[in-house]
Amino acid sequence: MTQAVKLASRVFHRIHLPLQLDASLGSRGSESVLRSLSDIPGPSTLSFLAELFCKGGLSRLHELQVHGAARYGPIWSGSFGTLRTVYVADPTLVEQLLRQESHCPERCSFSSWAEHRRRHQRACGLLTADGEEWQRLRSLLAPLLLRPQAAAGYAGTLDNVVRDLVRRLRRQRGRGSGLPGLVLDVAGEFYKFGLESIGAVLLGSRLGCLEAEVPPDTETFIHAVGSVFVSTLLTMAMPNWLHHLIPGPWARLCRDWDQMFAFAQRHVELREGEAAMRNQGKPEEDMPSGHHLTHFLFREKVSVQSIVGNVTELLLAGVDTVSNTLSWTLYELSRHPDVQTALHSEITAGTRGSCAHPHGTALSQLPLLKAVIKEVLRLYPVVPGNSRVPDRDIRVGNYVIPQDTLVSLCHYATSRDPTQFPDPNSFNPARWLGEGPTPHPFASLPFGFGKRSCIGRRLAELELQMALSQILTHFEVLPEPGALPIKPMTRTVLVPERSINLQFVDR
């Protein structure tokens, strides 16, 4: 009750706007009358809760963005208990908000994840840290991941993983389907690829994800990744007091994170032992390569607990981003054979005569390959929405958003806005090759923007380019006969509503 009173008091206070706001507040429409938080349109609390819990809203949060924008306009608000959220679904307003970011931008933290770290005495990684701790971690990791040259340095390591993926796809064809070329649940296969790839980069070792028999601890980790997003969505939708009455989602979330931390800790401890041997002068040829992220963190004297926290969270982020995007890309290419044929021709011509690793520089120069990935990320952004919590009053459109207000950036809605993307629900990579109007640069932000942008963007793009080039070099990808179209659903991240099954036919 006290929190509700404080919130009401704060909102009332903000109605009486200060005489002088930050200069950024007047950057647009200075002639307009500024309005307060209470003036923002939106559903009643009752209808908002009904939409969320009684109409399957948790699994279609991305669709609610589109419906909200259509009904209330580019900015609206909704309340859940004492928490009021402002939703922004216009690229101009998204840009206006993000341009006002502070030195350490704060987003809505996965509070249940942070609570798990606190209760289980685990270090926060880049996904759960905030403030100065987040800034320290970001500064430490960015040079190793965000610089294009740094990401390109992992191409040799990833090349071996991609070749193993092609071999695994061959082995999986026809298993349990009756069709000789059909691979069931390609997302499951690409989960294994995603973990193997990010594991090789972070730990410098192979995890066995793409072998005929996947190690049990690796299978446990992969299952935990899929499960934790479901439990996260449930725990975030429930007020804290309800966790005591319905303990299942919280217990499941803790189990999932404990399994992932245990997996990461085993592998980090192995790398710690190798680092100790290096310090003792043991010959390098007796140990795995030292060119991996964990090696650099040990060299920078980062604590083992912090390394484990970061490796755990980066493994999670790396698995889901690559697996879902790769699944959606091949799904769309199987349904658009003309695009697939053109892309295969571009890859063949663009990599002919290249050196041992044509995937490095050559693939980054292929315009259609890059356009296909951009179009898939527009249609199926891994994270359909992002958030910010401003540390001061800011202006968005003609509204003043008070400090500490949760603002949700509706990336799914802006990326399917027909005013930005004609025929927005259609797969059309040509829109990124100069065909049609140029969209607002903030209409599609699959990797975010600014200091809070995805730190693994360069690595993810490299993995996707390399995997697609090898898969399309070896296979023609066809849809499952008689399969109905597949829609996305929200599971914290955006995933297929059911398994994607595809045929991989030798070229």
Swiss-Prot record:
Keywords: Heme, Iron, Lipid metabolism, Membrane, Metal-binding, Mitochondrion, Monooxygenase, Oxidoreductase, Transit peptide. Its cofactor is heme. CDD domains: CYP27B1. Pathway: Hormone biosynthesis; vitamin D biosynthesis. InterPro entries: CYP11_CYP27_families, Cyt_P450, Cyt_P450_CS, Cyt_P450_E_grp-I, Cyt_P450_sf. It comes from the Eukaryota. Kidney. It is found in: Mitochondrion membrane. GO terms for biological process: bone mineralization; calcitriol biosynthetic process from calciol; calcium ion homeostasis; calcium ion transport; decidualization; G1 to G0 transition; negative regulation of cell growth; negative regulation of cell population proliferation. GO terms for cellular component: mitochondrial membrane; mitochondrion. Its EC number is 1.14.15.18. Its main location: mitochondrion. Heme binds at residue 454. Gene3D superfamilies: Cytochrome P450 (1.10.630.10). One of its GO terms (molecular function) is calcidiol 1-monooxygenase activity. It catalyses: calcidiol + 2 reduced [adrenodoxin] + O2 + 2 H(+) = calcitriol + 2 oxidized [adrenodoxin] + H2O; secalciferol + 2 reduced [adrenodoxin] + O2 + 2 H(+) = calcitetrol + 2 oxidized [adrenodoxin] + H2O; 25-hydroxy-24-oxocalciol + 2 reduced [adrenodoxin] + O2 + 2 H(+) = (1S)-1,25-dihydroxy-24-oxocalciol + 2 oxidized [adrenodoxin] + H2O; 25-hydroxyvitamin D2 + 2 reduced [adrenodoxin] + O2 + 2 H(+) = 1alpha,25-dihydroxyvitamin D2 + 2 oxidized [adrenodoxin] + H2O. Pfam families: p450. Activated by cardiolipin and dioleoyl phosphatidylethanolamine (DOPE), phospholipids found in the inner mitochondrial membrane. Inhibited by high substrate concentration. Belongs to the cytochrome P450 family. A cytochrome P450 monooxygenase involved in vitamin D metabolism and in calcium and phosphorus homeostasis. Catalyzes the rate-limiting step in the activation of vitamin D in the kidney, namely the hydroxylation of 25-hydroxyvitamin D3/calcidiol at the C1-alpha position to form the hormonally active form of vitamin D3, 1alpha,25-dihydroxyvitamin D3/calcitriol that acts via the vitamin D receptor (VDR). Has 1-alpha-hydroxylase activity on vitamin D intermediates of the CYP24A1-mediated inactivation pathway. This is 25-hydroxyvitamin D-1 alpha hydroxylase, mitochondrial. It comes from Mus musculus.
